[in-house]
Amino acid sequence: MAKMGSRKHLKTYKAPKTWPIHPKEDTWTVKPSAGSHSIENSLSLTLVIRDILKLADNSREAKRIINSGNVLVDGRVIKDYKFPVGFMDIIEIPKTGEVYRVLLDKKGRLQLNKIEENDSKLCKIVNKSTIKGGKIQVNLHDGKNVIIDENDYNVGDVIDLKVPDHEINEVFELKEGACVLITGGKHTGELGTVSEIIVNESSNPNTIIIENSAKDEFLTLKDYAFVVGEDAPAISLLEVNK
């Protein structure tokens, strides 16, 4: 008997809360394949084409569009209908000229935000290591990695990455005054400015104090802060994020 995790489809009522789908509209949806994003934090390309963008009436039509090479993710043609797209990924439909960035709304759901640019992506540094030759490899939140000569970047900083070439355009430091989008906890999807970073000496995770547009402050985990600009957003965001 096949394991539950190996099934290609998933009943919609069992889908993660991050998926913007309605159980009453469809019984089944397509699970994203294992990849750069976890199942909870990604959507299958079929779900995006059929359910969100409404470019297909059913899975068969969505697969045809995808298999024809009519969808790009981060500047690369993707023909895998189960391909996982997640936070900050750039989806492009060349035939319509439309480009979207995957973001989180305040309910923690993955949503598409229509944008103009298609060659710039924000990627958070989740860890780094020294490799052969003394160079530094920084590993990013979407599974990508970039090799740099100098150890100038810290975990938590965000790279403005040119796609698909993986060239670094700019780096946004996670520091006081930085503009951040919260990606977890009860403040998911909120935009704010870093007021203070609290480093705990114990095994407890580091925390961060954020000031929102109403000048109210809240405490959240440092890991939940995703820098989107130095003192203002460098990218377009969902209206609900602002």
Swiss-Prot record:
InterPro entries the record matches: Rib_uL2_dom2 (IPR014722), Ribosomal_eS4 (IPR000876), Ribosomal_eS4_central_region (IPR013845), Ribosomal_eS4_central_sf (IPR038237), Ribosomal_eS4_KOW (IPR041982), Ribosomal_eS4_N (IPR013843), S4_RNA-bd (IPR002942), S4_RNA-bd_sf (IPR036986)
Protein family according to the UniProt entry: Belongs to the eukaryotic ribosomal protein eS4 family.
Keyword Cell wall biogenesis/degradation: no
GO annotation, cellular component aspect: cytosolic small ribosomal subunit
Keyword RNA-binding in annotation: yes
CDD domains found in the cross-reference section: KOW_RPS4 (cd06087), S4 (cd00165)
SMART domains documented for this protein: S4 (SM00363)
GO MF: rRNA binding; structural constituent of ribosome
Descriptive protein name: Small ribosomal subunit protein eS4
Keywords tagged on the record: Ribonucleoprotein, Ribosomal protein, RNA-binding, rRNA-binding
Domain S4 RNA-binding: 43-106
Disulfide bonds: none
Pfam families, per the entry: Ribosomal_S4e, RS4NT, S4
Superkingdom classification of source: Archaea
GO biological process assignments: translation
